[in-house]
Amino acid sequence: MIQHAGLGYRRDLAEDFLSLSENSPICFIEAAPENWLKMGGRARKQFDRVAERLPLALHGLSMSLGGQAPLDTDLIDGIKEMMCRYDCTFFSDHLSYCHDGGHLYDLLPLPFTEEMVHHTARRIREVQDRLGCRIAVENTSYYLHSPLAEMNEVEFLNAVAREADCGIHLDVNNIYVNAVNHGLLSPEAFLENVDAGRVCYIHIAGHDAETPELLIDTHGAAVLPTVWDLLELAYTKLPTIPPTLLERDFNFPPFAELEAEVAKIADYQTRAGKEYRRAA
């Protein structure tokens, strides 16, 4: 069961995950299925051992939900098989596109238009039908705002989720990064207007500042106080407390520091005084 606070599984942290104490604040892990569908050897054996101990959430990198290229049915089938293998009940991916005749190796933004709402929602429904379960879509960080936009970011996110009848995977750091970079929608306005009943999962992470006006969502640093404040605010706006995961992709500190950040998430959840939501 995916609940409470978790930490993203990374191969560099395998030994730390294998030696977790019983009182660790880490209640679940998350992995990108693309990294594991064809992985074998020692790395896979370590992953399997950790996944036997902790519930697993899957978060995709390359579904290209808003793309124009046909959906990758082999990828979807591989994810479904992985969900069955690990008794995993949760999958999310980004509200973006990453294919254009081949992998672009980046998550590129979608124009916030009615046409794109219908296009993306249709593709999400196709994914859900093939997987046999509801998925969630994540608000992404983006660095170019389309002049074609007919609505703001949170209106677009809500519209897609409503038409696709899917969940919302809320990335608190991305809300902050986009607010600073574009100045179009304050974090407070985003959280006030997001479809709270659909928010079923949360990410929190660190970022780097290229300049005071340009933040990069790197997942390579500690979470900053302003982002912690937004997480606390998010919990006040939501009817229940979704599972919340700390993302850290590189530049790893001692594992105890990561556990301390996960423990801080758990503390914020407790202080919110609300029922915990299960991701499914």
Swiss-Prot record:
InterPro entries: MbnB/TglH/ChrH, Xyl_isomerase-like_sf. SUPFAM superfamilies: Xylose isomerase-like. NCBIfam families: PRK05409.1 (NF003818). Belongs to the UPF0276 family. This is UPF0276 protein NGO_1946. It comes from Neisseria gonorrhoeae (strain ATCC 700825 / FA 1090). The lineage of its organism: Bacteria, Pseudomonadati, Pseudomonadota, Betaproteobacteria, Neisseriales.
